[in-house]
From Swiss-Prot:
The active site is at residue 237. The gene is rhaB. Disulfide bonds join 68-222, 353-370, 413-417. This is Rhamnulokinase. It comes from Escherichia coli O17:K52:H18 (strain UMN026 / ExPEC). It catalyses: L-rhamnulose + ATP = L-rhamnulose 1-phosphate + ADP + H(+).
Amino acid sequence: MTFRNCVAVDLGASSGRVMLARYERECRSLTLREIHRFNNGLHSQNGYVTWDVDSLESAIRLGLNKVCEEGIRIDSIGIDTWGVDFVLLDQQGQRVGLPVAYRDSRTNGLMAQAQQQLGKRDIYQRSGIQFLPFNTIYQLRALTEQQPELIPHIAHALLMADYFSYRLTGEMNWEYTNATTTQLVNINSDDWDESLLAWSGANKAWFGRPTHPGNVIGHWICPQGNEIPVVAVASHDTASAVIASPLSGSRAAYLSSGTWSLMGFESQTPFTNDTALAANITNEGGAEGRYRVLKNIMGLWLLQRVLQERQINDLPALIAATQALPACRFTINPNDDRFINPDEMCSEIQAACRETAQPIPESDAELARCIFDSLALLYADVLHELAQLRGEDFSQLHIVGGGCQNALLNQLCADACGIRVIAGPVEASTLGNIGIQLMTLDELNNVDDFRQVVSTTANLTTFTPNPDSEIAHYVAQIHSTRQTKELCA
């Protein structure tokens, strides 16, 4: 039997994990084992919301060392993280300034300023990326305007995954899938757009040309002295999650469900027409030259904050209590900017309901019900937008990532969207990370080949839409009201 041992470092906004994958070539089987799991979260430092990158690096090294201590010879390592955030380095590779998080308020007003000065359509035609107030382009503009004293010291800007790969190898890389989240990469050249960079205030010399997934960045020397290749995987965690989504055929959509919900489909060509711009659709880079045509949805961040504020530790019990409540009594727009990082999420949700003359969710279960129903309704709207954009309906939706363990939300999604939902795999980002490593090691041919492996090894659960459910009736009522308004317009 021929085995490969690959390690995936998967960093999310709320937690991180070091996972060991064992791939058996002859039977094409893939098993995952969690080596080390650790918390991640926002910190307050010198008036900024930041990440503790030193703690994250220590946790990564601890996990890698644990694998080596077991006597396992690692064939390769890959790192994926969330998008848009970056670390600045000087000529000696030392950090400049703080690793500020995307939920910091320093970018307030800058997106509107960019649209006014550069033109919204021109920015979109250049980048193909949706307008989000925390995109890297606005973070860099905030930095150069608010902290100009740092500029002379900056030699390099590395996105998070590239920074941690640099810390392991001493080599710098700018991986393409994550680079596209910055709104600074030109969609036609796959290189940094000089006009957008100029507006951000950043120097093009801070960046190297983006590399597509699959190159070896450098080597990590383990405690035993072995040189282990560190592979540039699809380092945006959503890009990795999509690679591991067992999509079958062109009518399959995906929903990567976690702190953020990202819903979309794969395409060989980007969508940058006026319809896509009006819907704020993004065309993020994927593996093998594919585009991830998708839309960001605020996701389970709202629930995470409610759990934290209400000190709720038993999530299954909360979901069970939530399931007993009537649907759609309280609904909000999860994508409202007010929910990006409010002082108190519970109060913000209640205020949104109060302002729209709805009942006020008071109990833990009512708040959770509000979040789940609102997400499912937004999923239905976004799926409809995506289908209209490409001119073809979807036949199934693959929900992957940690959020796919929420059976109630999966069923609500199926009912609201009127589509078959297939949930799993849970560790999609980790698996996609491993998939690129196995391709780099010449164990697999391509993404479609890897998806066949995932389909046969992952635990997948199907949810069939119930047209008689409360939320399905609610959606039908909304659509009927919309059609009436359109006829009367």
